Regions:
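Extended beta-strand solenoid/passenger and fiber regions
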Residues: 629-714, 737-774
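Solvent-exposed edge beta-strands and adjacent loop segments
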Residues: 30-35, 39, 567-632, 740-761
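The substrate-binding groove and active-site-proximal loops of carbohydrate-active enzymes
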Residues: 216-222, 262-274, 327-343, 408-418, ...
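Extracellular beta-strand ligand-recognition surfaces/modules
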Residues: 86-88, 136-187, 193
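Substrate-binding cleft of secreted/luminal carbohydrate-active enzymes
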Residues: 161, 168-171, 240-253, 293, ...
Length: 774
């Protein structure tokens, strides 16, 4: 399907927003503080904070450059705030008041009149009218002064990068890690936000792309700093509909409680921290208002610093399971009843919010597994797991090695334990729903079906997950997808189908994921192609993971328009053999310029020749002439393509020879890639022309890998060979074949005069080669 990576807005729809629109503020803060911002009206925003240490500071941020919205929806960059004013009503509770030392301050980062980086600190109380907790504030940027008291240092308003308002706890001490006497929960409401002056409005992208059938996935850990309204604006504007899979994350949603030694750990009650609760309530409510369902997702992953030691999965040496994130997260043991109880209570709280928002209860259990380290060690040796699995467990030191029966049995029992834990979580969700509930399970196949560890599926894709354990099974394989490991993907699809038994209509697919922006140009085409491939399998619910990468890279999906008549192709052969009287003409397009010295400069505009045929001279009788006219009418003239056999070039062996499996080099194995385009090379050396072959004769095709002919392949559309397994690194993939040329009639009519034909005059019936993706 068509897509592009939009880097800027050109002629797309745009509009205007008021500068300082509440939807576009963000928050940020250091761990373990928590904060969120939600819009509570067209001119109002509320910030909730949960603070644990004297030095923690939450910033409510406005940036001159839009770093978070998709290019087609972003607001314009404008660093000049001169002659602009911002006014609002400030109300606060539980946080330090406006009139106090360290009270709310507008920190402005930019450059002074000399262009030197500078930071100004504008005390809001100096511009407030009212009480320290309920005041009206007006900030005229051309007249602002930095400092605790006025007069102060004038602010240069013409080159500002960003500004933020500080929100801290009473008793704040900058940089201090001393715990507060008790957790501080507070909030700030900025309402009646109004911008005036000469630069009070910003140009903003305002596209509403056609609905394309894909759905969106996002995560609170990626979006905690943005307002729910901003996320939903991007999702809807980019054409995503139906529902959103929303991962509640592993680091920002939980309430933390302090132990006697000062350590902050996840509250075993499963309570969400107040900022996360407020954010999710707003997100669910606003999604429902936009006819979007939300599928919350909860995983077994938890930020390591917040996880009690006894909850963690561990390897045989007792080391905790650590993911690759920095700082790391860990995995909860399915055997630990406290850990599973915490997950269950979190789920119960989330379901309660779904019901309060009037949304259907749909809930994803995301990627539950026993962690496997990079050394192949499986982490099922925590104390609770050892007890649950019977004690005195065999040490599975490396899943990449052959395993004895006792180890295989242990993996099976670990799988049963994992299945029991997910069944328990599902039961909690169903109970909390107090009515119908749809439970979905997400499985990440590159890990649980890693071919270097062929038995790990026993533990991490247990038979206890087989249908109908869950209403829907969701598959994610982004490691393989972005690597181009198509054979592994296909094998995994088939394995999962066989083992778990979910029909294709009961399966969903997650496509992604571009971690680094520099990989966008390479990875998004593979992701988009993978979406189409899975759709062709019959999977209807397709999700893009995840929104931050979509907006960062400008991924823009367009709906399918169906087959255009002008692009249609009838896979039929031209009904007459081309005789020697037929004309065949390869054509290139070349730009030739002559310099003042008389020398030519030549530039080939096409990498491949385009073939022209004149088949009129091959018509030998009035019967054939009648057939030709019928064939022309059936193709609607040049509207529909068809095959033709080139009498002078139709084989991989030379031009017309008998094919062998070694004729044409398609590529070299890398241990990952399994799909190869049929090609034919012309000429020797590095300057040879390589011609994609999109219309091979399937019954003539021969394939070899590493010089050995193989039958383990399938022929896909447009001449793509899919091998059953990826060729080893360095192995040559070759093929031999006969092929036809895709063509169309070159003109809208054919002129044939019966008297001329009877007199032996051949008509002219030109054909032109079609360029097909290949």
């Amino acid at each position: 399907m068509a897509f592009w990576l939009a880097q800027e807005r050109r002629s797309q729809e745009s509009g205007f927003i008021q500068r300082f629109d509440p939807r576009f503020w963000t928050v940020d803060f250091p761990r373990p503080a928590m904060a969120s911002a939600v819009t509570i009206g067209p001119d109002a925003i509320r910030v909730d904070v949960e603070l644990h240490h004297e030095g923690e500071l939450v910033g409510l941020i406005w940036e001159s450059v839009d770093r978070f919205d998709h290019a087609l929806l972003a607001y314009a960059t404008d660093r000049d705030y001169s002659h602009t004013s911002l006014s609002f009503r400030w109300r606060s509770e539980g946080v330090i008041a406006l009139d106090q030392p360290n009270g709310p301050t507008l920190t402005i980062e930019g450059r002074d009149e000399a262009g030197v980086s500078h930071t100004w600190y504008v005390r809001l109380w100096n511009y407030a009218e009212g009480s320290p907790t309920d005041a009206h504030i007006t900030l005229a940027f051309s007249n602002l002064e930095s400092g605790y008291t006025l007069p102060g240092t004038p602010v240069t308003p013409t080159d500002i990068d960003r500004m933020f308002i500080s929100i801290v706890a009473p008793g704040h001490s900058g940089g201090s890690t001393v715990p507060l006497a008790e957790r501080v929960n507070g909030h700030v409401v900025m309402s009646d936000i109004e911008t005036g002056g000469a630069r009070s409005m910003l140009d903003v992208g305002d596209v509403r792309l056609p609905v394309h059938g894909l759905r969106m996935a996002t995560a609170y850990d990626d979006a905690y700093n943005q307002t729910p309204a901003r996320l939903l604006r991007n999702i809807i504007g980019l054409g995503y509909r139906s529902d959103i899979v929303h991962y509640v994350g592993m680091s920002h949603f939980m309430r933390l409680e302090r132990l006697g030694d000062g350590t902050l750990l996840a509250d075993p009650s499963g309570t969400l921290c107040e900022p996360a609760r407020a954010w999710h309530e707003a997100f669910l409510e606003q999604a429902g208002e936009n006819d979007l369902e939300v599928i919350p997702s909860l995983s077994f992953e938890l930020f390591d610093a917040y996880c009690p030691q006894e909850w963690k999965q561990r390897d045989a040496a007792g080391a905790p399971a650590f993911t690759g994130w920095v700082p790391p997260s860990t995995l909860l043991s399915p055997a630990n009843m406290q850990a599973m109880g915490w997950l269950a209570e979190v789920a119960r709280n989330i379901v309660g919010m779904l019901r309060a928002a009037g949304l259907q209860v749909r809930f994803q259990i995301g990627e539950p597994w026993w962690w496997v380290t990079s050394a192949g060690e499986i982490c099922l040796y925590d104390d609770a797991a050892i007890t649950a699995l019977g004690g005195d467990l065999p040490n599975i030191g490396d899943l990449r090695k052959a395993l004895d029966p006792a180890s295989l049995d242990l993996l099976d029992r670990a799988g049963d334990l994992l299945a029991a834990s997910t069944a328990g979580l599902a039961a909690t969700v169903r109970d909390a729903a107090q009515g119908p509930a749809e439970i979905l399970l997400l499985a990440f196949t590159p890990t649980i079906l890693d071919p270097s560890m062929p038995e790990v599926h026993r533990a991490n894709l247990p038979s206890g997950w087989a249908w109908p354990a869950f209403e829907r099974l969701q598959i994610e394989d982004y490691d393989w997808l972005i690597e181009g490991a198509d054979a592994l993907r296909r094998e995994a699809f088939n394995f999962v189908d066989t083992k778990l038994g979910y029909s294709l209509v009961e399966q969903d697919y997650f496509a992604g994921f571009v971690l680094d922006a520099e990989d966008a140009e390479d990875f998004w085409p593979r992701i988009d192609r993978g979406i189409d491939e899975v759709s062709a399998r019959g999977v209807e619910r397709l999700y893009v993971w995840a929104l931050p990468q979509v907006t960062r890279d400008g991924y823009t999906r367009l709906p399918s328009t169906g087959k255009s008549d002008m692009q249609s192709f009838d896979d039929v052969l031209y009904p007459f053999a081309l005789g020697r009287s037929s004309a065949v003409a390869p054509e290139f397009s070349t730009s030739i310029s002559v310099t003042a010295s008389g020398h030519e400069r030549r530039n080939a505009l096409w990498s491949n020749a385009r073939m022209h045929f004149d088949v009129g001279p091959g018509i030998r009788s009035e019967t054939e002439l009648a057939e030709l006219i019928a064939f022309f009418r059936a193709r609607h003239g040049p509207a529909r393509g068809f095959r033709i056999s080139d009498p002078f070039d139709h084989s991989s062996a030379g031009m017309t020879g008998v094919p062998t499996a070694l004729d044409q080099l398609l590529g070299t194995g890398d241990g990952v890639r399994a799909d190869f385009q049929l090609m034919k090379s012309y000429g020797p050396g590095p300057e040879q022309q390589v011609r994609p072959i999109t219309r091979p004769r399937g019954d003539s095709l021969l394939v070899s890998v590493g010089g050995v002919q193989t039958g383990d392949w399938t022929l896909g559309p447009l001449g793509v060979i899919s091998l059953g397994s990826a060729p080893a690194e360095g192995a040559e993939v070759r093929a031999g074949f006969l092929f036809d040329v895709p063509v169309r009639f070159a003109e809208d009519r054919i002129d044939i005069a019966g008297i001329n034909f009877a007199a032996g005059e051949a008509p002219s019936i030109p054909l032109i080669e079609l360029r097909e993706a290949g």
